[in-house]
């Protein structure tokens, strides 16, 4: 499976092996070749997962509470938060099980651990696919709201958005279940294709939106006979925002999909084996992305922040 390291870690913990690395990483050790391996403490990983879990739960609760936020855009943001919640939750669950197995606090059979591993894999990959798809859906929604403003409410109707959301969830869960059960490497290629598609989609749409915004700002500048630097400053700020948005997406997701690509194309190569040993680092970056997503897409909304305060006050 693409997550060979995680599976070996679960089964290795069950059998009380001294180390919990992937079989690819062990092969690299036998060669004696030096590998750069970054260790992520379980406590840090679980702490980041908990922050992501709480943060995204608050986003879902705030959107569910306020009927004014039941618009197409916030539906996509809510689903993004829910999928990010599942990404962090599934990885936290696996890490917690490994810790309990290693501590001897959880006794179970290898077959049960294998079933648990497959279940976590399905949950992880389906939620990752959903997260990627909903990031792309938000980009499309923003694009339509800008370039088809007069037709937006006729294009992005709530029933149509609900069908899109249902299709994304069903397709992600179904494909992850089938591919992880029957075709081990296909799920890696599927995730890679979705990642590259969403990256290109976001880049094209946001660059087009930035270019149109710069043209609009330039038109206003000419209309009011202002100096060009004002327009240039707007363009630089927009370019910086776009760079940060795409950069965070690529830096957080890119290493994980590099891992999946190498698992498919060079599973036994020495250099690839060294990269596989840092699989937990790549998962940690994805968890960091699930923490950043609400800051980018949700908490910039004043309406949502007000509702979030109400949710927090009610919880006390």
UniProtKB/Swiss-Prot annotation:
Any one GO CC term of the record: plasma membrane
Membrane-spanning parts: 38-63, 73-93, 119-140, 164-183, 192-210, 240-265, 279-299
Keywords: Cell membrane, G-protein coupled receptor, Glycoprotein, Lipoprotein, Membrane, Palmitate, Receptor, Transducer, Transmembrane, Transmembrane helix
Topological category with respect to the lipid bilayer: Multi-pass membrane protein
Residue spans, topological domain Cytoplasmic: 64-72, 141-163, 211-239, 300-316
This protein's record includes keyword Repeat: no
A Pfam family the protein falls into: 7tm_1
GO BP, sorted A to Z: adenylate cyclase-activating G protein-coupled receptor signaling pathway
Residues carrying covalently attached carbohydrate according to the record: 29
Subunit record text: Interacts with MGRN1, but does not undergo MGRN1-mediated ubiquitination; this interaction competes with GNAS-binding and thus inhibits agonist-induced cAMP production. Interacts with OPN3; the interaction results in a decrease in MC1R-mediated cAMP signaling and ultimately a decrease in melanin production in melanocytes.
Function: Receptor for MSH (alpha, beta and gamma) and ACTH. The activity of this receptor is mediated by G proteins which activate adenylate cyclase. Mediates melanogenesis, the production of eumelanin (black/brown) and phaeomelanin (red/yellow), via regulation of cAMP signaling in melanocytes.
Designated name of the protein: Melanocyte-stimulating hormone receptor
Source species: Cebus albifrons (White-fronted capuchin)
């Amino acid at each position: 499976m693409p997550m060979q390291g995680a599976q070996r870690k679960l089964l290795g913990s069950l059998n009380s092996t001294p180390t919990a690395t992937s079989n690819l990483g062990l092969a690299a050790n036998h060669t004696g070749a030096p590998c750069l391996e970054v260790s992520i403490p379980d406590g840090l990983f679980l702490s980041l997962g908990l922050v992501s879990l709480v943060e995204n739960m608050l986003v879902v609760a705030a959107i569910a509470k306020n009927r004014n936020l039941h618009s197409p855009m916030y539906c996509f943001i809510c689903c993004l938060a829910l999928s990010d919640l599942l990404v962090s939750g599934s990885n936290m669950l696996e890490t917690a099980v490994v810790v309990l197995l290693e501590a001897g606090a959880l006794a179970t059979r290898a077959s049960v651990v294998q079933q648990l591993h497959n279940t976590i894999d399905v949950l992880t990959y389906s939620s990752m696919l959903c997260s990627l798809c909903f990031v792309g859906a938000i980009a499309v929604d923003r694009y339509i709201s800008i370039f088809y403003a007069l037709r937006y409410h006729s294009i992005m109707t709530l029933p149509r958005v609900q069908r899109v959301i249902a299709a994304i969830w069903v397709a992600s869960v179904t494909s992850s279940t089938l591919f992880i059960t029957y075709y081990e490497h296909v799920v890696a290629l599927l995730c890679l294709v979705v990642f590259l598609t969403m990256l290109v989609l976001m880049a094209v749409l946001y660059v087009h939106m930035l270019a149109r915004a710069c043209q609009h700002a330039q038109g206003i500048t000419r209309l009011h006979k202002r100096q060009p630097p004002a327009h240039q400053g707007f363009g630089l700020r927009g370019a910086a925002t776009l760079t940060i948005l795409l950069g965070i997406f690529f830096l957080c997701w890119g290493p994980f999909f590099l891992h999946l690509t190498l698992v498919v194309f060079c599973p036994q190569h020495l250099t690839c084996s060294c990269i596989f040993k840092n699989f937990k680092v790549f998962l940690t970056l994805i968890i960091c992305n699930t923490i950043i997503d609400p800051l980018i897409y949700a908490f910039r909304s004043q309406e949502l922040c007000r509702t979030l305060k109400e949710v927090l006050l009610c919880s006390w």
